[in-house]
Amino acid sequence: MTNTRKNHPLMKIMNNSLIDLPAPSNISSWWNFGSLLGACLTLQIITGLFLAMHYTADTTTAFSSVTHICRDVNYGWIIRYLHANGASMFFLCLFIHIGRGLYYGSFTLLETWNVGIILLFTVMATAFMGYVLPWGQMSFWGATVITNLLSAIPYIGINLVEWIWGGFSVDKATXTRFFAFHLILPFIIMAXVMVHLLFLHETGSNXPLGTPSDSDKIPFHPYYTIKDXLGLLLLXLLAMTLVLFSXDLLXDPNNYMPANPLNTPPHIKPEWYFLFAXAILRSIPNKLGGVLALFFSILILAIIPLLHTAKQQSMIFRPLSQYLFWILIANLFTLTWIGGQPVEHPYIVIGQTASILYFSLILIIMPLVNLIENKMLKW
């Protein structure tokens, strides 16, 4: 009798990706976040679909339609808050997933890493456009400020911004196109996730030791399916606690005021997951310089494989690199805190110092320390 799971053209792909996949026997809970990201993406697409059924992409009715979802639609409030806080869960998992890749040297799987960077940019673009849709004060002014950054591009900047706006300011055309993009991008993300997994399964997963694990593999199911299901349970617990007890904890109160082009909020800031980038952007007094720093603060991930000068892949046996890695994480926390503060005396200097340290650690200090550790292997 033929085994359908192993022979059916469609089931064979699923089987080789999720059931009979040979996986390293020692991957820790830090490897759970890939599946959690998949769960977050699924949640966002499902809740987003239901929200799109009731939302109207028009400046006059967008704010009211979101209010209508929360008040009149059956369980609309939970769908809306699952979607809003689901984005926070998504980015939390995303940052941990990238941090894991940096710590354990997963960036040596070049294709997987590069597709991951493209995914990060796409998810960030999607989240930004989603934040604009409720058409509250912070939505409107966030859209104005961020799109305006493109005007720093020499020669074509102003034309580019007006082309994106669909007019001379953020208006009805902007809301409509942002909704269209926000709707289509998650499906593009899904396609890129398939490519990400395709490249990952070509090489196999990295392991905490950073050594080849071909000699010691175990089937993905049941060992890692049960482990992933536990991670999912904990994520669901965190998400539901957030949604049901303090749904607005991570949001901005200004977004409960309808957009008013005549009244600028005292402090325009993005959601928490973009604050580190906002702090880097603000720390440079020049507009073009700030935009470039913002862009390269994320694109810098692409050159990390080139800066990897260590003889060992993982940081597990490199105490100095570990120390610098945790300084980098603390620095990112500092940048996130600074991004949420007003632009005044102590915060400006702290932000500039943290921004310089961020780039210095990645570009100069860590590669040098890697070389020192290589020398230490001979002592």
Swiss-Prot record:
Concerning CDD domains, the annotation shows: cytochrome_b_C (cd00290), Cytochrome_b_N (cd00284)
One of the record's GO molecular function terms: ubiquinol-cytochrome-c reductase activity
- What is the UniProt remark on how the cofactor binds and its stoichiometry? Binds 2 heme b groups non-covalently.
Name a biological process GO annotation.
Answer: mitochondrial electron transport, ubiquinol to cytochrome c
Q: Which residues bind heme b b562?
A: 83, 182
Residue ranges crossing the lipid bilayer per the database entry: 33-53, 77-98, 113-133, 178-198, 226-246, 288-308, 320-340, 347-367
The entry's cellular-component GO terms read:
mitochondrial inner membrane; respiratory chain complex III
Which metal ions or organic cofactors does this protein require, according to UniProt? heme b
List, alphabetically, the PROSITE patterns matched: CYTB_CTER (PS51003), CYTB_NTER (PS51002)
- Which residues participate in a ubiquinone binding? 201
Function of the molecule: Component of the ubiquinol-cytochrome c reductase complex (complex III or cytochrome b-c1 complex) that is part of the mitochondrial respiratory chain. The b-c1 complex mediates electron transfer from ubiquinol to cytochrome c. Contributes to the generation of a proton gradient across the mitochondrial membrane that is then used for ATP synthesis.
**Annotated family:** Belongs to the cytochrome b family.
Q: How does this protein assemble?
A: The cytochrome bc1 complex contains 11 subunits: 3 respiratory subunits (MT-CYB, CYC1 and UQCRFS1), 2 core proteins (UQCRC1 and UQCRC2) and 6 low-molecular weight proteins (UQCRH/QCR6, UQCRB/QCR7, UQCRQ/QCR8, UQCR10/QCR9, UQCR11/QCR10 and a cleavage product of UQCRFS1). This cytochrome bc1 complex then forms a dimer.
Please tell me what else the database record remarks about this protein: Heme 1 (or BL or b562) is low-potential and absorbs at about 562 nm, and heme 2 (or BH or b566) is high-potential and absorbs at about 566 nm.
Alphabetized PANTHER family for the sequence:
CYTOCHROME B
Q: What is this protein called?
A: Cytochrome b
Give the organism, scientific name.
Varecia variegata variegata
